[in-house]
């Protein structure tokens, strides 16, 4: 086990200060009779529902989106990678979904998996956590375990979540230190580690980090997740678990920024960055490949550096390296815009008035997730320059209003590529026939190396 807290040490401490509530919940988790509540039925929450249902726990899902709740009630799925058969199997195991938060009182453990976006000033927007905590508090009862999974800055669990929960009408307090009395509830942070579209690692094989507000909460959290994950990793405090999640994603953000910057240098030097990365990957130690692209997307990697930078200012610390990585990645859609303009210019065409087909709007290949997708930024930038933009994505027949954009665009058919002045590959979905696209298009600009192995005068990689 990595350096840090060992579960046997946590268990020893917790058992010496156990309460009737602690023992009761521990037993329920062991014999699978605990009622599990999952708040937020999106890309993180719904997979959690399925994992617990597979282990014969009775699960209740909570969401403010009635459309999602109704879809699940009918045995349907709104996430492409989760088939309806899995929803129906969960229902057979007792899963129900509701918008009624009063049913929180029925739960033994409540997992919070709600969004934590940034506001327009790149500052943390924790309004969903606040609203969820305020919805839980009136129905909180002694002995419940509340676990926050949403990605956030270190200190959120202790400084934000717990004080709101402790405003409950029963006067219950979060268990602290050795106080696990009968008027307490248990609190922990356990960061989600979902990787949409990654089929190489089973969800149950992803180790689960858990940091409780006290040792008893850590043990209960590990007991809870130990039922669905093959390994749990206890740490000494929620803030350690919160920082762990940020480190994981900032590591990726910084390395992606590095290869994005190297890509722009290699373009000027006439060197193929993809060939460079492939060659460097043959080194059996000290190197891990990261790949350039049109920008970064998803809920975590584009946002987490700004969460930590914001919190660091409270401690008079400037995280310049992290902030620079965020700036490099944020600038990549502008690099794509410039590359399209230059490619059109070489064909004696202007970007203003050009017909551009954007292939792929999901933030990465083979998923139905638009969150923070660089494609949305690129479409808006092209439109502002006067381009006539269309798009195709096998997972999105329509792109409407989102957190930052209101594009209101319908997917066009995947045909007649020659009618467009430029076909821009933003997301390299496996469904696309790239050889055909290059063959039938006037100009193709590839931001993902999707056309590797293809050579043509109308093909530009950027």
Language-model region placement:
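Structural/interface elements that position substrates and couple domains in central-metabolism enzymes
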Residues: 2-462
């Amino acid at each position: 086990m990595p350096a840090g807290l060992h579960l046997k040490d946590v268990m020893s401490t917790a058992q010496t200060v156990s309460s009737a509530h602690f023992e009761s919940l521990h037993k329920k988790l062991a014999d699978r009779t605990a009622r599990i509540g999952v708040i937020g039925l999106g890309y993180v929450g719904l997979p959690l529902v399925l994992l617990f249902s597979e282990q014969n726990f009775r699960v209740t899902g909570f969401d403010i989106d009635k459309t999602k709740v109704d879809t699940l009630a009918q045995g349907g799925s709104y996430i492409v990678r989760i088939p309806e058969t899995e929803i129906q199997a969960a229902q057979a195991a007792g899963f129900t979904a509701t918008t009624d938060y009063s049913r929180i009182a029925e739960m033994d453990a409540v997992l919070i998996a709600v969004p934590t976006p940034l506001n327009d000033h790149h500052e943390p927007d924790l309004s969903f956590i606040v609203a969820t905590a305020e919805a839980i508090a009136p129905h909180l009862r002694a002995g419940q375990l509340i676990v926050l999974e949403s990605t956030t800055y270190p200190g959120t669990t202790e400084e934000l979540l717990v004080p709101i929960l402790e405003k409950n009408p029963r006067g219950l307090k979060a268990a602290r230190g050795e106080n696990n009395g009968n008027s307490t509830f248990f609190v922990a942070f356990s960061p989600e580690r979902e990787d949409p579209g990654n089929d190489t690692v089973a969800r149950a094989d992803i180790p689960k980090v858990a940091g409780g507000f006290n040792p008893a909460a850590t043990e209960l959290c590990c007991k809870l997740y130990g039922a669905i994950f093959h390994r749990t990793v206890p740490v000494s405090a929620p803030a350690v678990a919160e920082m762990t999640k940020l480190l994981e994603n900032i590591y990726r953000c910084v390395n992606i920024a590095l290869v994005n910057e190297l890509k722009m240098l290699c373009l000027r030097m006439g060197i193929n960055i993809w060939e460079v990365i492939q060659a460097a990957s043959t080194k059996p130690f000290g190197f891990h490949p990261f790949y350039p692209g049109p920008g970064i997307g998803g809920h975590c990697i584009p946002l987490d550096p700004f969460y930590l930078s914001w919190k660091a200012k409270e401690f008079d610390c400037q995280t310049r390296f992290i902030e620079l990585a965020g700036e490099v990645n944020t600038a990549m859609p502008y690099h794509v815009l410039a590359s399209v303009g230059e490619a059109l210019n070489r064909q004696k065409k202007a970007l203003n008035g050009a017909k551009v087909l954007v292939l792929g709007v999901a933030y990465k290949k083979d998923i139905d997730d638009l969150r923070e997708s660089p494609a949305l930024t690129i479409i808006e930038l092209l439109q502002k320059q006067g381009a006539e933009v269309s798009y195709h994505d096998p997972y999105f027949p329509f792109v409407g209003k989102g957190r930052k954009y209101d594009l209101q665009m319908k997917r066009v058919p995947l045909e007649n590529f020659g009618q467009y002045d430029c076909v821009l590959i933003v997301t390299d979905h496996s469904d696309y026939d790239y050889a055909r696209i290059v063959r039938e298009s006037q100009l193709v600009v590839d931001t993902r190396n999707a056309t590797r192995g293809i050579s043509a005068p109308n093909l530009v990689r950027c």
